[in-house]
A protein has these predicted regions:
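Extended, charge-rich alpha-helical interface modules
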Residues: 1-82
Length: 82
């Protein structure tokens, strides 16, 4: 997942899993508690992936190497103001 394409693919996989969870809940294959817990984890992973893409773009735009970007911890990414 060290390229923009790889990050986008990871995001797509997370979104697909999110949809699958909602479908599983609708068909009573999982409990609402299970869905909620997994969705929260997916949201954090998505926030981290989008943050990494933004870092890479910012580095590229300022003459830096996008490879210097690093995934930030959930505690950092989740404390950003929208």
């Amino acid at each position: 997942m060290t390229t923009d394409q790889g990050i986008h693919e990871h995001i797509a996989a997370l979104v697909a899993e999110e949809k699958s969870l909602r479908d599983q809940l609708a068909s009573a294959q999982i409990t609402p508690d299970d869905e909620h817990a997994r969705l929260k984890a997916l949201e954090i992973q998505l926030d981290q992936a989008w943050d990494l893409l933004r870092q890479r773009r910012a580095l590229r735009e300022t003459g830096g190497s996008p490879d210097d970007a690093a995934e930030r911890p959930a505690s950092v990414v989740e404390s950003y103001l929208e």
